Amino acid sequence: MTITRILTCLLICLFIRIPAAGTKTTQLIFKRFTEETCQNDPCLNGGTCTPGKLSCTCATGWMGRYCHRKCRNIYKSCDRWAVEDKCHTILTQTNFFDVNCAISCKMCSPDPNYVAPEIPLAPALEPMQFFLGKWHSRASKGLRFPTDLYDTEYEEIIDIAPANVPMFGPPSLNFTSTSWFGDDTRVVHGFITLKPNSFPPEVAILSTSNEGLNMIELGTLKHHVLTLNVSYMQVHPTMDSKVLPLGATRRLRRVGSLLEMTVAKLFSENKVSQFKKMFKKIADYAF
């Protein structure tokens, strides 16, 4: 079994685990619009708010609860699902087909002049959309997540991009971190996913690096602040244990146009290393 399959199986087990006795899980539930809601008019791009409805009535070319996205299908199987009458036969059970197959299910009318990006952002991942892009940082010290560099300075690019949606399972974002100075290059590849209908959103990052470290980070997204804890580490025997933390927490949040990452790492003898980095966006992704 490959490392990717192992990490995926671990993620599924963590996300569908049975809650312990006495704990409560909160499910995201959308409330219907009220007269007061419609007075504030949350609908965008010419959409109409109607009391009693769950979403706005969108103008041509737009979709989403608030008409905030261009009208399009998210899944390539939408036309087939529509032929199988998936759009309406299970409408009372889920709104999956309404929001992910809006054109095929005739929930919106596309703009003929709009050229949609090849890879869309799945609606389930919209809480993470403000992290999308390529982010660059230049550090004056070797402090880094998950392991420090031996040099006293380095550069890093974090790339968070939409990924093709799977036929089954939760959608994800591609995640890549590249850090370098001279001949020392550290690369981390992985993906980010959210637990469906969780509130606040439960987030997981599964990653593997060219250092020989595989990780699972679990956390929550609250008020546009993503807090993650390392929940699983698989270490290659040849990896330098001196730079490997026993545990780590990192926090990502937007500060204006910048991305802030705050890290705390725990080492033996209760030694704690803390640092903060600021990233500037150098590229964006349309979705």
UniProtKB/Swiss-Prot annotation:
Its main location: membrane. Changing C108Y: In allele wx74; hermaphrodites and adult males appear slightly dumpy, with males having swollen bursal rays and much lower mating efficiency than that of wild-type males. It is a single-pass type II membrane protein. Pfam families: THAP4_heme-bd. Keywords: Cell membrane, Developmental protein, Disulfide bond, EGF-like domain, Glycoprotein, Membrane, Signal-anchor, Transmembrane, Transmembrane helix. Expressed in hypodermis first at the two-fold stage and throughout the larval stages but not at the adult stage. Detected in the body seams after the L4 stage with expression maintained in adults. Detected in the male tail structural cells at the late L4 stage and also maintained in adults. Detected at different developmental stages in vulva, PQR neurons and several neuronal processes in the head region. Glycans are attached at N174, N229. Disulfide bonds join C38-C49, C43-C56, C58-C67. Residues 34-68 form the EGF-like domain. This is Protein male abnormal 7. It comes from Caenorhabditis elegans. The gene is mab-7.
